[in-house]
């Protein structure tokens, strides 16, 4: 297990009770290096959407825990954010939330001369994702072939 995975798992275990008490959902935790800086990020959500004030309350409570537990020896910045509209589907609850909604799939290699697919999410399991396009055609993708899967953005 990488040190990033250890930090993420430990952070999840500390932040989850805070979020549960507020009826918020933990979407993801990531520990990444960007531009020479380390970032520990928690992405949270709730029915109706997360506000800046929500993020601030969670960050304040979590910062107390991070200072007390001090399990990350490196210098880092802790951020709490809404996951944003274009976030990838990663966890089971992301798939459940997006059932029968329009999603975008990008594949690593072209399938029938295309790498981008749009359709309604109809089914998923640990290995596959099935969508139905606007013509009613059903396509099943192996998750190992998917580079990106997210809710489609309508503009």
From Swiss-Prot:
Main location: cytoplasm
Pfam families tied to this protein: DUF150_C, RimP_N
Compartments reported by the entry: Cytoplasm
Main function: Required for maturation of 30S ribosomal subunits.
Recorded GO CC terms: cytosol
SUPFAM superfamilies associated with the record: YhbC-like, C-terminal domain (SSF74942), YhbC-like, N-terminal domain (SSF75420)
Keywords attached to this entry: Cytoplasm, Ribosome biogenesis
The name this protein goes by in its record: Ribosome maturation factor RimP
InterPro entries recorded: Ribosome_maturation_RimP, RimP_C, RimP_C_sf, RimP_N, RimP_N_sf
Lineage: Bacteria, Bacillati, Bacillota, Clostridia, Lachnospirales
Gene: rimP
Biological process according to GO: ribosomal small subunit assembly; translation
Family according to the record: Belongs to the RimP family.
């Amino acid at each position: 297990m990488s040190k990033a995975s250890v930090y993420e798992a430990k952070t999840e275990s500390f932040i989850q009770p805070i979020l549960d008490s507020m009826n918020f959902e933990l979407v993801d935790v990531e520990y990444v290096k960007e531009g020479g800086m380390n970032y520990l990020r928690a992405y949270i959500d709730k029915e109706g959407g997360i506000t800046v004030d929500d993020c601030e309350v969670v960050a304040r409570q979590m910062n107390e825990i991070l200072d007390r537990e001090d399990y990350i020896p490196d210098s880092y910045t802790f951020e709490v954010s809404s996951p944003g509209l274009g976030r990838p589907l990663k966890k089971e609850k992301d798939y459940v939330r997006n059932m029968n909604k329009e999603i975008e799939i990008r594949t690593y290699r072209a399938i029938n001369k295309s790498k981008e697919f749009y359709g309604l999410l109809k089914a998923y399991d640990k290995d596959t994702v099935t969508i139905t396009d606007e013509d009613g055609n059903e396509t099943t993708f192996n998750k190992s072939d998917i580079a990106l899967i997210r809710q489609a953005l309508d503009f």
